Protein backbone atom coordinates (compact mmCIF):
# COMPACT_ATOMS: atom_id res chain seq x y z
CA UNK A 1 0.00 0.00 0.00
CA UNK A 2 1.28 3.47 -0.90
CA UNK A 3 2.23 5.46 2.20
CA UNK A 4 2.79 9.10 3.03
CA UNK A 5 6.03 10.32 4.59
CA UNK A 6 4.26 10.61 7.95
CA UNK A 7 2.90 7.08 7.75
CA UNK A 8 6.33 5.67 6.92
CA UNK A 9 8.00 7.31 9.91
CA UNK A 10 5.14 6.53 12.30
CA UNK A 11 4.92 2.86 11.27
CA UNK A 12 8.69 2.42 11.63
CA UNK A 13 8.42 3.44 15.29
CA UNK A 14 5.46 1.38 16.47
CA UNK A 15 6.55 -0.72 19.45
CA UNK A 16 3.16 -2.20 20.24
CA UNK A 17 -0.25 -1.95 18.62
CA UNK A 18 -3.32 -3.99 19.53
CA UNK A 19 -6.98 -3.52 18.71
CA UNK A 20 -8.73 -1.05 20.96
CA UNK A 21 -5.54 0.56 22.24
CA UNK A 22 -3.56 3.63 21.22
CA UNK A 23 -0.29 2.62 19.53
CA UNK A 24 2.92 2.84 21.55
CA UNK A 25 5.78 4.41 19.58
CA UNK A 26 9.51 4.66 20.22
CA UNK A 27 11.07 8.10 20.68
CA UNK A 28 14.52 8.63 19.16
CA UNK A 29 15.32 12.08 20.52
CA UNK A 30 14.13 13.90 23.64
CA UNK A 31 14.95 17.60 23.96
CA UNK A 32 14.58 19.22 27.37
CA UNK A 33 14.54 22.79 28.72
CA UNK A 34 14.10 24.46 32.08
CA UNK A 35 10.36 25.19 32.03
CA UNK A 36 8.55 21.88 31.37
CA UNK A 37 11.04 19.41 32.85
CA UNK A 38 11.19 19.94 36.67
CA UNK A 39 7.99 18.05 37.50
CA UNK A 40 8.96 15.24 35.13
CA UNK A 41 12.30 14.73 36.88
CA UNK A 42 10.47 14.88 40.22
CA UNK A 43 8.17 12.11 39.00
CA UNK A 44 11.12 9.85 38.19
CA UNK A 45 12.63 10.57 41.57
CA UNK A 46 9.38 9.88 43.44
CA UNK A 47 9.06 6.44 41.83
CA UNK A 48 12.80 5.71 42.09
CA UNK A 49 13.04 5.31 38.31
CA UNK A 50 16.17 5.95 36.25
CA UNK A 51 16.18 7.98 33.07
CA UNK A 52 15.74 5.29 30.42
CA UNK A 53 18.04 6.73 27.72
CA UNK A 54 20.23 9.63 28.85
CA UNK A 55 22.18 9.15 25.62
CA UNK A 56 19.07 10.16 23.64
CA UNK A 57 18.30 13.16 25.84
CA UNK A 58 19.69 16.68 25.43
CA UNK A 59 18.98 19.73 27.58
CA UNK A 60 19.54 23.46 27.26
CA UNK A 61 18.47 26.70 28.90
CA UNK A 62 16.46 29.00 26.66
CA UNK A 63 13.00 30.22 27.74
CA UNK A 64 13.95 32.18 30.86
CA UNK A 65 17.47 33.30 30.05
CA UNK A 66 18.51 36.93 29.97
CA UNK A 67 19.74 38.18 26.61
CA UNK A 68 21.85 40.95 28.15
CA UNK A 69 23.95 38.99 30.67
CA UNK A 70 24.99 35.44 31.54
CA UNK A 71 23.89 36.03 35.14
CA UNK A 72 21.50 33.17 35.96
CA UNK A 73 19.53 35.42 38.33
CA UNK A 74 18.99 38.24 35.83
CA UNK A 75 15.48 37.17 34.78
CA UNK A 76 14.13 36.89 38.30
CA UNK A 77 13.87 34.41 41.14
CA UNK A 78 11.57 31.89 39.44
CA UNK A 79 13.77 31.80 36.34
CA UNK A 80 16.86 31.27 38.49
CA UNK A 81 15.19 28.40 40.36
CA UNK A 82 14.10 26.71 37.13
CA UNK A 83 17.55 26.93 35.56
CA UNK A 84 19.37 25.78 38.69
CA UNK A 85 16.89 22.92 39.05
CA UNK A 86 17.54 21.86 35.46
CA UNK A 87 21.29 21.85 36.12
CA UNK A 88 20.83 19.74 39.27
CA UNK A 89 18.48 17.30 37.53
CA UNK A 90 20.76 16.87 34.53
CA UNK A 91 23.71 16.15 36.81
CA UNK A 92 21.72 13.61 38.85
CA UNK A 93 20.26 11.77 35.84
CA UNK A 94 23.26 11.99 33.50
CA UNK A 95 21.79 14.30 30.87
CA UNK A 96 23.96 16.46 28.59
CA UNK A 97 23.23 20.08 29.46
CA UNK A 98 24.19 23.09 27.40
CA UNK A 99 23.93 25.73 30.12
CA UNK A 100 24.35 29.49 29.90
CA UNK A 101 28.12 29.27 29.55
CA UNK A 102 28.28 26.41 27.06
CA UNK A 103 29.25 27.04 23.44
CA UNK A 104 26.22 25.03 22.28
CA UNK A 105 23.62 26.86 24.40
CA UNK A 106 20.66 28.19 22.49
CA UNK A 107 16.98 27.88 21.75
CA UNK A 108 16.24 24.16 21.84
CA UNK A 109 14.82 24.10 18.28
CA UNK A 110 17.87 25.91 16.90
CA UNK A 111 20.39 23.86 18.89
CA UNK A 112 19.04 20.44 17.86
CA UNK A 113 19.33 20.84 14.10
CA UNK A 114 22.64 22.70 14.08
CA UNK A 115 24.30 19.93 16.14
CA UNK A 116 22.98 17.08 14.00
CA UNK A 117 20.75 15.80 16.80
CA UNK A 118 17.81 16.21 14.43
CA UNK A 119 17.91 13.56 11.70
CA UNK A 120 15.48 12.39 8.98
CA UNK A 121 13.15 9.55 9.87
CA UNK A 122 13.48 10.02 13.62
CA UNK A 123 10.82 10.74 16.22
CA UNK A 124 11.57 13.84 18.28
CA UNK A 125 9.68 15.25 21.25
CA UNK A 126 10.10 18.21 23.57
CA UNK A 127 7.94 19.91 26.15
CA UNK A 128 7.41 22.81 23.78
CA UNK A 129 4.72 23.36 21.16
CA UNK A 130 7.12 24.41 18.41
CA UNK A 131 8.94 21.07 18.33
CA UNK A 132 7.36 20.74 14.87
CA UNK A 133 10.38 22.74 13.65
CA UNK A 134 12.42 19.54 13.36
CA UNK A 135 9.96 18.11 10.84
CA UNK A 136 11.85 20.14 8.23
CA UNK A 137 14.27 17.19 8.15
CA UNK A 138 11.61 14.56 7.52
CA UNK A 139 11.38 13.67 11.19
CA UNK A 140 8.14 13.25 13.11
CA UNK A 141 8.49 15.94 15.76
CA UNK A 142 5.86 17.32 18.10
CA UNK A 143 5.41 19.01 21.44
CA UNK A 144 4.34 17.11 24.55
CA UNK A 145 3.03 17.96 28.01
CA UNK A 146 4.92 17.53 31.27
CA UNK A 147 3.31 14.17 32.11
CA UNK A 148 4.36 12.91 28.68
CA UNK A 149 7.86 14.27 29.26
CA UNK A 150 8.05 12.04 32.33
CA UNK A 151 6.72 9.05 30.34
CA UNK A 152 9.42 9.48 27.70
CA UNK A 153 12.09 9.88 30.37
CA UNK A 154 10.97 6.66 32.04
CA UNK A 155 10.29 4.48 28.98
CA UNK A 156 11.60 6.21 25.82
CA UNK A 157 8.12 5.57 24.39
CA UNK A 158 4.85 7.43 24.05
CA UNK A 159 1.22 6.55 23.36
CA UNK A 160 0.25 8.22 20.09
CA UNK A 161 -2.79 7.79 17.88
CA UNK A 162 -2.50 8.07 14.13
CA UNK A 163 -3.27 11.53 12.80
CA UNK A 164 -5.06 12.48 9.61
CA UNK A 165 -2.81 13.57 6.76
CA UNK A 166 -2.78 16.86 4.85
CA UNK A 167 -0.50 17.88 2.01
CA UNK A 168 0.06 21.57 1.41
CA UNK A 169 1.75 22.20 -1.93
CA UNK A 170 3.25 25.57 -2.85
CA UNK A 171 3.71 25.34 -6.60
CA UNK A 172 5.96 27.48 -8.75
CA UNK A 173 8.77 29.82 -7.77
CA UNK A 174 8.70 32.56 -5.16
CA UNK A 175 9.22 36.15 -6.25
CA UNK A 176 12.42 37.94 -5.29
CA UNK A 177 12.50 38.85 -1.60
CA UNK A 178 9.71 36.50 -0.54
CA UNK A 179 10.84 34.42 2.43
CA UNK A 180 9.81 31.19 4.10
CA UNK A 181 8.03 33.26 6.76
CA UNK A 182 5.89 34.88 4.08
CA UNK A 183 5.11 31.43 2.69
CA UNK A 184 3.96 29.94 5.97
CA UNK A 185 1.96 33.04 6.96
CA UNK A 186 0.23 32.92 3.56
CA UNK A 187 -0.51 29.23 4.13
CA UNK A 188 -2.02 29.90 7.55
CA UNK A 189 -4.00 32.79 6.10
CA UNK A 190 -5.54 30.44 3.54
CA UNK A 191 -6.03 27.35 5.71
CA UNK A 192 -6.93 29.21 8.90
CA UNK A 193 -5.37 29.05 12.35
CA UNK A 194 -7.38 25.90 13.15
CA UNK A 195 -7.56 24.45 9.64
CA UNK A 196 -4.93 21.82 10.33
CA UNK A 197 -6.41 20.54 13.59
CA UNK A 198 -6.09 16.76 13.81
CA UNK A 199 -3.63 16.55 10.92
CA UNK A 200 0.05 16.00 10.36
CA UNK A 201 0.90 18.29 7.45
CA UNK A 202 3.41 17.52 4.73
CA UNK A 203 4.68 20.64 2.96
CA UNK A 204 5.54 20.03 -0.69
CA UNK A 205 5.86 21.69 -4.08
CA UNK A 206 8.59 23.49 -6.00
CA UNK A 207 8.67 26.52 -3.70
CA UNK A 208 9.15 24.35 -0.60
CA UNK A 209 11.84 22.25 -2.29
CA UNK A 210 13.64 25.48 -3.19
CA UNK A 211 13.92 26.60 0.43
CA UNK A 212 17.11 26.25 2.47
CA UNK A 213 16.99 24.14 5.63
CA UNK A 214 16.63 27.34 7.64
CA UNK A 215 13.61 28.26 5.54
CA UNK A 216 12.10 24.81 5.85
CA UNK A 217 12.49 24.99 9.63
CA UNK A 218 10.57 28.28 9.62
CA UNK A 219 7.72 26.65 7.71
CA UNK A 220 7.51 23.55 9.90
CA UNK A 221 7.91 25.64 13.06
CA UNK A 222 4.58 27.29 12.34
CA UNK A 223 2.67 24.13 11.41
CA UNK A 224 1.29 24.22 14.93
CA UNK A 225 -0.12 27.69 14.18
CA UNK A 226 -2.56 26.21 11.68
CA UNK A 227 -3.58 23.70 14.33
CA UNK A 228 -1.55 20.76 13.04
CA UNK A 229 0.05 18.12 15.25
CA UNK A 230 3.26 18.35 13.25
CA UNK A 231 4.70 19.51 9.95
CA UNK A 232 7.06 17.51 7.74
CA UNK A 233 9.14 18.01 4.60
CA UNK A 234 10.69 15.08 2.74
CA UNK A 235 14.50 14.95 3.01
CA UNK A 236 16.55 15.59 -0.12
CA UNK A 237 20.08 16.64 -1.08
CA UNK A 238 19.60 20.00 0.66
CA UNK A 239 18.86 18.11 3.88
CA UNK A 240 21.88 15.84 3.51
CA UNK A 241 24.24 18.72 2.76
CA UNK A 242 23.07 20.51 5.91
CA UNK A 243 23.49 17.46 8.16
CA UNK A 244 26.88 16.34 6.84
CA UNK A 245 29.66 17.04 9.34
CA UNK A 246 27.40 18.05 12.22
CA UNK A 247 28.57 16.89 15.66
CA UNK A 248 25.97 14.20 16.36
CA UNK A 249 25.30 13.23 12.74
CA UNK A 250 26.43 9.85 11.38
CA UNK A 251 29.92 9.74 9.87
CA UNK A 252 31.64 7.64 7.20
CA UNK A 253 29.96 4.37 6.23
CA UNK A 254 27.19 4.96 8.75
CA UNK A 255 26.35 8.21 6.97
CA UNK A 256 26.24 6.47 3.59
CA UNK A 257 23.81 3.89 4.95
CA UNK A 258 21.73 6.60 6.59
CA UNK A 259 21.52 8.64 3.38
CA UNK A 260 20.20 5.64 1.46
CA UNK A 261 17.41 5.32 4.02
CA UNK A 262 16.73 9.04 4.29
CA UNK A 263 16.17 9.37 0.54
CA UNK A 264 13.46 6.70 0.73
CA UNK A 265 11.48 8.92 3.09
CA UNK A 266 9.07 10.54 0.71
CA UNK A 267 5.39 10.03 0.09
CA UNK A 268 4.76 7.25 -2.40
CA UNK A 269 3.12 7.95 -5.73
CA UNK A 270 -0.60 7.52 -5.17
CA UNK A 271 -0.42 7.83 -1.38
CA UNK A 272 -3.73 9.06 0.00
CA UNK A 273 -3.98 12.34 1.88
CA UNK A 274 -7.11 13.18 3.83
CA UNK A 275 -6.86 16.79 2.70
CA UNK A 276 -4.97 18.67 -0.02
CA UNK A 277 -4.24 22.41 -0.19
CA UNK A 278 -2.53 24.13 -3.11
CA UNK A 279 -1.02 27.61 -3.25
CA UNK A 280 0.60 29.42 -6.17
CA UNK A 281 3.99 30.76 -5.09
CA UNK A 282 3.67 33.70 -7.49
CA UNK A 283 0.69 34.99 -5.49
CA UNK A 284 2.63 35.27 -2.23
CA UNK A 285 3.65 38.80 -1.20
CA UNK A 286 5.37 39.99 2.00
CA UNK A 287 2.98 39.18 4.84
CA UNK A 288 1.99 41.00 8.04
CA UNK A 289 -0.50 39.83 10.66
CA UNK A 290 -3.09 42.40 11.70
CA UNK A 291 -4.98 40.47 14.39
CA UNK A 292 -4.46 38.22 17.37
CA UNK A 293 -3.92 34.86 15.71
CA UNK A 294 -1.51 34.01 12.88
CA UNK A 295 -4.38 33.37 10.47
CA UNK A 296 -5.38 37.04 10.63
CA UNK A 297 -2.79 38.03 8.06
CA UNK A 298 -2.61 40.06 4.85
CA UNK A 299 -0.09 41.12 2.25
CA UNK A 300 1.67 44.30 3.34
CA UNK A 301 0.06 46.30 0.52
CA UNK A 302 -3.50 45.17 1.29
CA UNK A 303 -6.01 46.99 3.52
CA UNK A 304 -7.10 45.45 6.81
CA UNK A 305 -10.28 43.46 6.10
CA UNK A 306 -13.66 44.37 7.55
CA UNK A 307 -15.12 41.79 9.96
CA UNK A 308 -18.19 41.56 7.70
CA UNK A 309 -15.99 40.22 4.89
CA UNK A 310 -15.70 36.90 6.73
CA UNK A 311 -18.51 34.44 6.01
CA UNK A 312 -18.15 32.64 9.33
CA UNK A 313 -19.85 34.38 12.26
CA UNK A 314 -17.14 33.24 14.70
CA UNK A 315 -14.49 34.70 12.40
CA UNK A 316 -16.40 37.98 12.28
CA UNK A 317 -16.55 38.12 16.06
CA UNK A 318 -12.87 37.22 16.34
CA UNK A 319 -11.95 39.95 13.84
CA UNK A 320 -13.89 42.63 15.75
CA UNK A 321 -12.24 41.64 19.00
CA UNK A 322 -8.80 41.56 17.36
CA UNK A 323 -9.21 44.99 15.78
CA UNK A 324 -10.22 46.48 19.11
CA UNK A 325 -7.26 44.90 20.91
CA UNK A 326 -4.80 45.92 18.18
CA UNK A 327 -6.29 49.45 17.92
CA UNK A 328 -6.73 49.14 14.16
CA UNK A 329 -9.56 49.92 11.73
CA UNK A 330 -10.99 48.06 8.72
CA UNK A 331 -9.59 49.47 5.49
CA UNK A 332 -6.49 50.83 7.21
CA UNK A 333 -3.13 50.21 5.51
CA UNK A 334 -0.49 48.66 7.75
CA UNK A 335 2.11 50.75 5.94
CA UNK A 336 0.53 53.73 7.73
CA UNK A 337 0.90 52.10 11.16
CA UNK A 338 3.85 53.15 13.34
CA UNK A 339 5.68 50.64 15.53
CA UNK A 340 7.45 50.93 18.88
CA UNK A 341 9.63 47.84 18.97
CA UNK A 342 11.17 45.29 16.65
CA UNK A 343 12.13 41.76 17.62
CA UNK A 344 14.29 39.66 15.31
CA UNK A 345 14.74 36.23 16.85
CA UNK A 346 12.83 33.17 18.21
CA UNK A 347 12.87 29.52 17.13
CA UNK A 348 11.09 30.68 13.96
CA UNK A 349 13.61 33.20 12.64
CA UNK A 350 16.90 33.41 14.57
CA UNK A 351 19.19 31.35 12.34
CA UNK A 352 22.06 32.66 10.28
CA UNK A 353 20.02 33.02 7.08
CA UNK A 354 17.44 35.09 8.98
CA UNK A 355 20.09 37.41 10.40
CA UNK A 356 21.67 37.84 6.98
CA UNK A 357 18.31 38.85 5.50
CA UNK A 358 17.72 41.40 8.25
CA UNK A 359 21.28 42.75 8.02
CA UNK A 360 20.89 43.26 4.26
CA UNK A 361 18.06 45.70 4.99
CA UNK A 362 19.80 47.32 7.98
CA UNK A 363 23.11 47.91 6.17
CA UNK A 364 23.68 51.64 5.67
CA UNK A 365 20.43 52.62 7.37
CA UNK A 366 19.48 53.75 10.89
CA UNK A 367 16.79 52.58 13.27
CA UNK A 368 13.99 55.16 13.27
CA UNK A 369 13.72 57.59 16.18
CA UNK A 370 11.68 56.22 19.06
CA UNK A 371 12.00 52.58 17.95
CA UNK A 372 13.81 49.93 20.00
CA UNK A 373 15.08 47.07 17.82
CA UNK A 374 16.46 43.82 19.22
CA UNK A 375 18.38 41.15 17.33
CA UNK A 376 18.62 37.92 19.32
CA UNK A 377 20.57 35.07 17.67
CA UNK A 378 19.09 31.65 18.27
CA UNK A 379 22.21 30.04 19.69
CA UNK A 380 25.83 30.63 20.60
CA UNK A 381 26.76 28.92 17.33
CA UNK A 382 24.60 31.30 15.30
CA UNK A 383 25.94 34.28 17.26
CA UNK A 384 29.54 33.26 16.61
CA UNK A 385 28.92 32.77 12.89
CA UNK A 386 27.08 36.08 12.58
CA UNK A 387 29.94 37.88 14.32
CA UNK A 388 32.48 36.15 12.09
CA UNK A 389 30.54 37.53 9.10
CA UNK A 390 30.37 41.01 10.64
CA UNK A 391 26.58 41.03 10.91
CA UNK A 392 26.71 42.25 14.51
CA UNK A 393 28.59 45.37 13.39
CA UNK A 394 25.99 46.09 10.71
CA UNK A 395 23.20 45.88 13.27
CA UNK A 396 25.03 47.92 15.90
CA UNK A 397 25.98 50.66 13.43
CA UNK A 398 22.34 50.88 12.38
CA UNK A 399 21.19 51.24 15.99
CA UNK A 400 19.91 47.73 16.66
CA UNK A 401 20.71 45.98 19.94
CA UNK A 402 22.83 42.83 19.52
CA UNK A 403 21.84 40.39 22.25
CA UNK A 404 22.80 37.01 23.73
CA UNK A 405 20.93 33.85 22.62
CA UNK A 406 17.57 32.93 24.11
CA UNK A 407 13.83 32.82 23.48
CA UNK A 408 13.69 36.52 24.40
CA UNK A 409 10.65 38.54 23.36
CA UNK A 410 8.83 35.63 21.72
CA UNK A 411 7.06 35.16 25.05
CA UNK A 412 6.82 37.25 28.20
CA UNK A 413 8.84 34.81 30.31
CA UNK A 414 12.01 36.87 30.71
CA UNK A 415 13.00 40.54 30.79
CA UNK A 416 12.40 41.17 27.08
CA UNK A 417 8.76 42.17 26.77
CA UNK A 418 6.36 44.81 25.54
CA UNK A 419 4.79 47.43 27.75
CA UNK A 420 0.99 47.88 27.58
CA UNK A 421 -0.04 49.41 24.26
CA UNK A 422 3.33 48.99 22.57
CA UNK A 423 3.29 47.70 19.00
CA UNK A 424 5.96 45.26 17.81
CA UNK A 425 7.07 43.95 14.44
CA UNK A 426 8.18 40.47 15.43
CA UNK A 427 9.73 37.50 13.63
CA UNK A 428 8.28 35.10 16.22
CA UNK A 429 5.37 32.71 15.74
CA UNK A 430 2.46 33.85 17.92
CA UNK A 431 0.55 37.12 18.06
CA UNK A 432 -1.94 36.16 20.77
CA UNK A 433 -3.15 38.78 23.24
CA UNK A 434 -0.42 39.38 25.82
CA UNK A 435 2.02 36.95 24.21
CA UNK A 436 4.91 39.45 24.28
CA UNK A 437 3.75 41.28 27.38
CA UNK A 438 0.49 42.39 28.96
CA UNK A 439 -1.60 44.42 26.49
CA UNK A 440 1.25 44.35 23.96
CA UNK A 441 0.39 44.30 20.24
CA UNK A 442 2.29 41.82 18.09
CA UNK A 443 2.55 41.76 14.29
CA UNK A 444 4.28 38.72 12.78
CA UNK A 445 6.64 39.38 9.87
CA UNK A 446 9.77 38.03 8.19
CA UNK A 447 13.27 39.11 9.29
CA UNK A 448 13.62 41.44 6.30
CA UNK A 449 10.21 42.98 6.97
CA UNK A 450 11.10 43.42 10.66
CA UNK A 451 14.33 45.20 9.75
CA UNK A 452 12.42 47.39 7.29
CA UNK A 453 9.96 48.34 10.03
CA UNK A 454 12.86 49.21 12.32
CA UNK A 455 14.48 51.63 9.90
CA UNK A 456 11.26 53.25 8.65
CA UNK A 457 9.39 53.33 11.96
CA UNK A 458 6.35 51.66 10.41
CA UNK A 459 5.50 48.59 8.39
CA UNK A 460 7.14 48.87 4.99
CA UNK A 461 7.08 46.84 1.80
CA UNK A 462 10.64 45.60 1.35
CA UNK A 463 10.04 45.52 -2.41
CA UNK A 464 9.81 49.33 -2.35
CA UNK A 465 12.91 50.07 -0.24
From Swiss-Prot:
This protein's pathway: Amino-acid biosynthesis; L-leucine biosynthesis; L-leucine from 3-methyl-2-oxobutanoate: step 2/4
Reaction catalysed by this enzyme: (2R,3S)-3-isopropylmalate = (2S)-2-isopropylmalate
Record note on cofactor: Binds 1 [4Fe-4S] cluster per subunit.
An annotated GO BP: L-leucine biosynthetic process
EC number of this enzyme: 4.2.1.33
PROSITE patterns: ACONITASE_1 (PS00450), ACONITASE_2 (PS01244)
Record key words, sorted: 4Fe-4S, Amino-acid biosynthesis, Branched-chain amino acid biosynthesis, Iron, Iron-sulfur, Leucine biosynthesis, Lyase, Metal-binding
The keyword Iron-sulfur belongs to this UniProt entry's keyword annotation: yes
GO-annotated molecular function: 3-isopropylmalate dehydratase activity; 4 iron, 4 sulfur cluster binding; metal ion binding
InterPro entries registered for this protein in UniProt: 3-IsopropMal_deHydase_lsu, Acnase/IPM_dHydase_lsu_aba_1/3, Acoase/IPM_deHydtase_lsu_aba, Aconitase_4Fe-4S_BS, Aconitase_4Fe-4S_dom, IPM_dehydratase_rel_enz, IPMI_cat
PANTHER family assigned: 3-ISOPROPYLMALATE DEHYDRATASE, HOMOACONITASE, MITOCHONDRIAL-RELATED
Stored NCBIfam families: leuC, PRK05478.1, PRK12466.1
Function: Catalyzes the isomerization between 2-isopropylmalate and 3-isopropylmalate, via the formation of 2-isopropylmaleate.
HAMAP family named among the record's database cross-references: LeuC_type1
Family under the similarity heading: Belongs to the aconitase/IPM isomerase family. LeuC type 1 subfamily.
UniProt subunit comment: Heterodimer of LeuC and LeuD.
Name this polypeptide is given: 3-isopropylmalate dehydratase large subunit
Organism, as annotated: Aeromonas salmonicida (strain A449)
Amino acid sequence: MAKTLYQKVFDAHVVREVDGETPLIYIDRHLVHEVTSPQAFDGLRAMNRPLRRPDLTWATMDHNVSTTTKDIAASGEMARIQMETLADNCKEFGVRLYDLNHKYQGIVHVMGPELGITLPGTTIVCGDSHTATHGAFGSLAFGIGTSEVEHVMATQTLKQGRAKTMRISVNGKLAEGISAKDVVLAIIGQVGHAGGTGYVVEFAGEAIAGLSMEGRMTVCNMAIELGAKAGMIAPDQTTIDYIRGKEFAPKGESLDQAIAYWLSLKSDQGAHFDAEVILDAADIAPQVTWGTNPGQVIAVNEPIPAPESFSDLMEQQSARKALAYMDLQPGQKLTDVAIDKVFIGSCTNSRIEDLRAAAAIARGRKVAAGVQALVVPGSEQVKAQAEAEGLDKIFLEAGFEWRLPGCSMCLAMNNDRLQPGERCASTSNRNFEGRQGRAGRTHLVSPAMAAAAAVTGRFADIRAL
